[in-house]
Amino acid sequence: MKHTAEFLDTHQTQISSILSGGYNHPLLREWQNERQLAKNMFIFPLFVSDMPDEDQPIESLPNIRRFGVNKLAGYLKPLVAKGLRAVLLFGVPMKPNSKDEFGSAADDPEGPVIQAIKLLRAEFPELYILCDVCLCEYTSHGHCGVLYDDGSINREQSVRRLAAVAVNYAKAGAHSVAPSDMIDGRIRDIKLGLLAAGLAHKTFVMSYAAKFSGNLYGPFRDAACSAPSQGDRKCYQLPSGGRGLARRALRRDLDEGADGIIVKPSTFYLDIMADASEIAKDVPICAYHVSGEYAMLHAAAKAGVVDFKSIAFESHQGFLRAGARLIISYMTPEFLDWLS
């Protein structure tokens, strides 16, 4: 005998349990998002070489290239036309003997970052320019500060050197400085340096307050030639399980004068982003979708595991849901097209 489908009497269902009427249409699903991705949220990282005519693909970062100053304007012009609003500059010294123990090339007036700042201010007056402030790309040892003879970080000299670099970027025309070194006390010294230079009122200090050590930076270190020659950065970058430390670092950097906060990496640290949006609710929170995260999504899409556009939106919408207002993303060029 054929079984007859049975229907239970559900007349006691609570009205409040019916949710699907709120998202049964594509527009309704958009309205359910607390925030929408928009072009003005995106910050595009740029690797700027001290070889003026360089235009070199980075194998471990699909679709990302390293440019010399002479190639920057031509590359950026169509992106600016599509709505690019902000870039984050990383200098990459490639010339022989360009690195030393103090990272002297970081703020060399003839170096890649200061030359790029001046070029971009002239060519794209409306483009917002952030500069990463760190020494790892420029030091002979590849660490983010000045070292003692035993290889440990000399905090006092490091923060003084980082402050000098930040001030020199601001003097050259950078709108924002973004210290990524994670050395204790550098936000205070940078803020004091900007005050002394008369630039604090027009320079946004975007602190990498919650930057974790881990396994997601490999492609970046290829691009920036910044891997440590010995040891690692675990003594100054946060341990991956250190949520309490991250909360303390967020409070510290706010107390020292940070105007904005970066959480890095992002996908695996949404709890930290949510913490940041609570602790630093009065300043912009920025998610950094780092090189390893970007490369993983490309690899998954290439293997046919995911659709690249769909996973890009899902991951980046997750940052907004966790509390980010801004996103540093290597996918910025794609999003400029997708959001048009």
UniProtKB/Swiss-Prot annotation:
Residues where Zn(2+) binds: 134, 136, 144
Keyword terms of this UniProt record: Heme biosynthesis, Lyase, Metal-binding, Porphyrin biosynthesis, Zinc
Keyword Metal-binding: yes
UniProt binding sites for 5-aminolevulinate 2: 291, 330
Catalytic activity field: 2 5-aminolevulinate = porphobilinogen + 2 H2O + H(+)
InterPro entries noted in UniProt: ALAD, ALAD_AS, Aldolase_TIM
Record-annotated active site: 211 (schiff-base intermediate with substrate), 264 (schiff-base intermediate with substrate)
GO MF entry, a single one: zinc ion binding
Cofactor: Zn(2+)
Cofactor note: Binds 1 zinc ion per monomer.
A Pfam family hit: ALAD
EC main group: lyase
Gene Ontology process terms (BP): heme biosynthetic process; protoporphyrinogen IX biosynthetic process
PROSITE patterns noted in UniProt: D_ALA_DEHYDRATASE
EC number: 4.2.1.24
Pathway where this protein functions: Porphyrin-containing compound metabolism; protoporphyrin-IX biosynthesis; coproporphyrinogen-III from 5-aminolevulinate: step 1/4
Binding residues annotated for 5-aminolevulinate 1, in chain numbering: 221, 233
GO cellular component terms attached to this protein's record: cytosol
Function: Catalyzes an early step in the biosynthesis of tetrapyrroles. Binds two molecules of 5-aminolevulinate per subunit, each at a distinct site, and catalyzes their condensation to form porphobilinogen.
Subunit structure: Homooctamer.
UniProt cross-references to PANTHER family, sorted A to Z: DELTA-AMINOLEVULINIC ACID DEHYDRATASE
Similarity-based family: Belongs to the ALAD family.
Name of this chain's protein: Delta-aminolevulinic acid dehydratase
Species: Eremothecium gossypii (strain ATCC 10895 / CBS 109.51 / FGSC 9923 / NRRL Y-1056) (Yeast)
Gene responsible for this protein: HEM2
